[in-house]
Amino acid sequence: MAFDKKLLDIVACPVCKGKLEYDKTAQQLICKADKLAYPITEGIPVLLENRATPITETV
């Protein structure tokens, strides 16, 4: 099942309540403010803080 990008208008980061970005390749929703990635399982975003993984920016 594919992720519906329309959900980006209504979902928010559960930590900071900020906007999330969709990473199609990794099938994750990214919160740049908190540097967290939330998995998408079978098209459903798992917006639980304990399921998020920290992301690091490579320069």
From Swiss-Prot:
Q: Which GO terms describe its cellular component?
A: cytosol
Source domain of life is Bacteria
What Gene3D superfamilies does this protein map onto?
2.20.25.10
Q: Which Pfam families match?
A: Trm112p
Q: Where is the signal peptide?
A: none
User: What family name appears in the similarity comment?
Assistant: Belongs to the UPF0434 family.
User: What's the protein name?
Assistant: UPF0434 protein Sputw3181_2540
Species, as recorded = Shewanella sp. (strain W3-18-1)
Q: What is the lineage of its organism?
A: Bacteria, Pseudomonadati, Pseudomonadota, Gammaproteobacteria, Alteromonadales
